[in-house]
Amino acid sequence: MRAGCGALAALALALTGFSLPSLGQAGPVVQVDFSNPGLSPSHWTLIIHPDGSAHFHSERGNAPSATPQNSDSIRLVVPDQDRDLRLSAQFARHVFEAARNDKWFNVKCESHRKVAFQGWKRLSYSGPEGQGSCEFNYSNDEEIEALGDSMVSVANTILEGARLEMLLQHDRLGLDQEIEYIVEAQGEGRVQQICAIRGILARLADDPGVMERVRKRARLLLEKKEE
C-alpha cells in the first residue's frame, strides 16, 4: 500500500505514552509494534492517528555501535529514536480502512507457514469501536500482509532520515551514498511516505555546504509523488 504525501498539515500531536488504552482516550489510533532481535533497531513502534499525525519510537537493541567515521553509511546504526512526524492523510485513511476491513484486527493473522523470519509485526487498533490486535511474521490475509509491509517501509524511511541527520552533522561526504540508496529504495517500494522526513530533505536541498548531487536528489525526493 503506497500513498502520496500531499501537503503538510499542522505539526504532529505530542504523545505522552505508547499504551493503547491511554491513546484511545484522544481518539482512534492504529499502532504497529515490530521486533526482530537480529536487526537494528531490534524493536520499533509506530502510532498513527486518522489525520496522519504519528509518533515513532525505536530501540537499537544489542547491535554493535557505529559512527559515520567507521561505518558504511547505508548500514549506519541509528541511535534510539523518539519523534513525532506527519504522514499523509491518504496513507492514514488506507491504514484505518484496513483496520475496519479486518475487524479492527480481531482476527488470526499469522499463517504459521514455514517462511523466512522477517520480524514479528503486531497490529493494534483502539477506538470507539473497541480494541483489537493480531501478530504475525507472515499473513495469508493479503491486506494485512500488505499493511505490515507498508509499515516496515515507513519505518525504513524514518530511519533513513535519521541517518541523513547524523551524516549531515558528522560526515557530509557520506550523504551522497546514503541519499542515492534512498532514491533507489523508494523506486523499489522499500521506503514509503517520504513526507515523514521532509524536514531533513529540505535542509539538504537548501544547504550550499553539501554536494550539488545530494541537493539535487533531495529536491527530487521532495518533488516526486508517491502513488
Where are the regions a protein language model picked out?
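Positively charged n-region of N-terminal signal peptides that target proteins for export
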Residues: 1-4
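N-terminal secretory signal peptides
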Residues: 26, 35-67
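Charged, amphipathic alpha-helical segments
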Residues: 88-112
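Short, well-ordered, aromatic-rich surface patches in folded extracellular/luminal domains
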Residues: 20-38, 105-227
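A short, structured loop/turn motif at beta-sheet edges
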Residues: 48-51, 85-94, 125-131
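A short, surface-exposed interaction/processing loop segment used at functional sites
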Residues: 54-69, 152-165
